[in-house]
């Protein structure tokens, strides 16, 4: 019986975290869920090509020229069509409203490039996070996968992985190390953990 949990990945750019998820699905790290849909807020995102190469359905929902409500409705329509149960934010650059998040309680996960509660919340994204860590002088940083709620980076933590900061690090070098040594490892592992728990709950009801 194939009762895998349907996953959608929301993207805006190059899709390196999406690729990590696709690779994890191929290699058997993600077995309880299946990526059924990739939704991009940018029609030119290379992530769409990655999805296409992996034979995954795609949808483009651009924010430009429409209200937040219309933008979110277009995403919800795409998700509902594929009966999506878990949403993974992988470099998705749009903020989702509290109303949207409430529709998927503890079903939306995000990866943040620091050890929350450090260097997180409003204004902390991309290279800014790594610059802040270097400016502060911390010796260890990392990545966190957490559930998404209405507070930026405020949802319950699912997994964390630490990464050492080296003496001559720049924000760019540190970003690459955190991606390779933390984000690409814990995002697929956390997606599997969440899907496995949902699958077990579904099986209990059968």
Language-model regions, residue ranges each:
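One-carbon transfer enzymes
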Residues: 1-206
